[in-house]
């Protein structure tokens, strides 16, 4: 594993021993990276490279536009996803891929919560990612359903994975508890438009 710092972001690169393996870009917390990688290895996943980006400003880097605080003690989401995506595409990916054993077979983008929202949003901004995974994606985010239903992805992904935990809809916060209905609606809309 090699670690870099690019624009205050920590980039951990886990190369595959096999040249030309796929590369997965995972936006995550720094304390989760090693356990994610170890669990994937324990599952016996096919050869792949993992590039984990952490030290993110979650409410800025992972959100597509401004949204006010969702609770009294929360901070607003400030809509820096486009700037972060540019950093990912123009600086992080070239530096990370220069350290890999050959060009990737394909690229995937994955994330949990707001990073899951970002993974889906990024598909509407760039055609670089062939696959994406949105784990417990923040599909409660104001305006995201309207955006998904009124825009087209830059390319049809080979695979798009959604997951949703069993506790997301049990919150008393009316903003957050719509994730239970919005995640399947996103899936159904994308499937109807032959995106999946």
Task: Place the predicted regions along the sequence by residue.
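A domain-start/cap signature at the N-terminus of enzymes
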Residues: 1-22, 48
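Serine-hydrolase catalytic machinery in alpha/beta-hydrolase-like enzymes
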Residues: 20-99
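Gly/Ala-rich beta-loop-alpha elbow adjacent to hydrolase catalytic centers
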Residues: 111-115
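Short glycine-enriched nucleophile-adjacent loop
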Residues: 116-125
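Alpha-helical scaffolding within the catalytic cores
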Residues: 117-118, 142-152
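Active-site nucleophile loop of the alpha/beta-hydrolase fold
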Residues: 133-140, 167
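Catalytic His-Asp charge-relay segment
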Residues: 158-165
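Single conserved hydrophobic/aromatic residue that forms the stacking wall/gate
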Residues: 189-196
């Amino acid at each position: 594993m090699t670690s870099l710092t690019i624009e205050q972001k920590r980039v951990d690169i886990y190369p595959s021993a096999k040249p030309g393996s796929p590369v997965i870009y995972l936006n995550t917390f720094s304390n989760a990276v090693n356990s994610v990688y170890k669990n994937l290895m324990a599952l016996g996943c096919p050869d792949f490279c993992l590039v984990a980006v952490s030290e993110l400003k979650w409410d800025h880097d992972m959100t597509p536009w401004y949204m006010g605080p969702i609770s009294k003690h929360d901070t607003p989401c400030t809509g820096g996803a486009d700037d972060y995506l540019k950093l990912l595409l123009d600086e992080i990916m070239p530096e990370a891929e220069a350290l890999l054993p050959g060009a990737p077979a394909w690229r995937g983008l994955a994330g949990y919560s707001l990073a899951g929202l970002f993974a889906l949003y990024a598909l509407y901004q760039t055609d670089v990612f062939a696959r994406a995974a949105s784990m417990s994606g923040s599909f409660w985010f104001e305006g995201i359903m309207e955006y998904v239903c009124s825009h087209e992805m830059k390319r049809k992904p080979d695979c798009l994975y959604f997951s949703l935990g069993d506790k997301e809809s049990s919150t008393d916060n009316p903003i957050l508890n719509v994730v239970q209905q919005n995640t399947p609606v996103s899936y159904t809309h994308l499937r109807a438009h032959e995106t999946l």
